[in-house]
A protein has these predicted regions:
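DNA polymerase processivity clamps
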Residues: 1-18, 22-77, 92-204
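Glycine-rich, pocket-lining loop/helix-strand segments that form or immediately flank
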Residues: 80
């Protein structure tokens, strides 16, 4: 038994996924973004139950992934990965629970008028509802109000709308838990049917 902890970050957001696997070694490697995109593209051609073998060459600093009879070899990035655990909140003081489909629709509507340079959307949750608002340089305003469950103090917090939309596209479950502390701390997002995935987005 064993596991793979996969993490990626760009400084503004972070995604972490834990996979239960069979492995015989402990190691930490950094794979280039280009290689990850290529692997992801190729995986779409294989069924979900295809055998995947992952290996690592210490001498050549190569990462090798084999899917059935198909093999990908990539050079690795040398160095140490940032301590991502410092970015993931250990605890949060409030939580918004929102229907994923409703949240996605609301963000898509508001994105039509969002400022294309800053792409900011402000979320203001209350006990049973959440107000979303965005504007652009043409003084156009997009706003919506959706049903949520919220158990925290009054707060308004801004995010890059594209980051929220990206998470919604990949998170598993019918509802999303948005866990927050304050307006300046990273926000934790989890799907109700996705215990192995964690997403963190920094507020604007």
């Amino acid at each position: 038994g064993g596991k793979i902890v996969s993490v990626c970050t760009d400084g503004h957001r972070l995604a972490k996924y834990v996979s239960n696997i069979s492995c015989n070694d402990d190691l930490s490697i950094i794979i280039p973004r280009k290689a990850i995109l290529e692997i992801n593209r190729i995986l779409t051609y294989f069924s979900s139950n295809s055998d995947i073998l992952i290996s690592y060459s210490y001498n050549n600093k190569n990462f090798i992934i084999q899917i059935n009879d198909f093999r990908i070899i990539s050079k690795l990035i040398e160095g140490n990965y940032p301590d991502f655990n410092k970015v993931i909140p250990e605890s949060t003081s409030a939580e918004i629970t929102v229907d994923k489909k409703t949240f996605k629709t609301s963000l898509n509507i508001i994105s039509k008028v969002v400022n294309q340079q800053y792409k900011g959307v402000k979320l203001t949750p209350q006990k049973d509802t959440m107000h979303l608002i965005s504007s652009n340089t043409d003084t156009e305003i997009g706003e919506d109000q959706i049903d949520v469950k919220y158990d925290g103090e009054d707060i308004s917090i801004g995010f890059n709308i594209s980051y929220l939309q990206d998470v919604i596209e990949v998170i598993d479950g019918d509802s999303i838990h948005i866990c927050i502390n304050d307006q300046n701390s990273g926000c934790l997002l989890k799907g109700n049917n996705d215990p192995n995935s964690v997403f963190v987005i920094m507020p604007m």
